[in-house]
Swiss-Prot record:
Name of this protein: Small ribosomal subunit protein uS11
NCBIfam families: PRK05309.1, uS11_bact
Keyword list, A-Z: Ribonucleoprotein, Ribosomal protein, RNA-binding, rRNA-binding
Task of the protein: Located on the platform of the 30S subunit, it bridges several disparate RNA helices of the 16S rRNA. Forms part of the Shine-Dalgarno cleft in the 70S ribosome.
Signal peptide, first to last residue: none
Chain's gene name: rpsK
Amino acid sequence: MAKAAAPRIRKKERKNIISGVAHVLSTFNNTMITISDAQGNAIAWSSAGAQGFKGSRKSTPYAAQVAAEDAGRKAREHGMETLEIEVSGPGSGRESALRALQAVGFSITSIRDMTPVPHNGCRPRKRRRV
């Protein structure tokens, strides 16, 4: 029986991009951070689930902070220094993700809230009664 060839893994090259955009999507269940260049090509990404948080711990501000630090560290390896931040979603990890990106060492030029607001579109889900 012939031996299967091992898949070749290419080493990621350093991209040398100075400025970019951090897209922070904070839902009720998770927080996802994607750092892209000005054209929208993803450079680095991370999420609370990818950092090992499971279940309701994914929606905590601390999980968002850990995910933002990880994505920021990956983007710094590509030479990124300045960020514009686009925040969307109603979750609890919005502010802590911003603070974590600032703590990594990025200079933040602008913060935009891109949360979609309906002009009376779809019917919302039923209200929670606790």
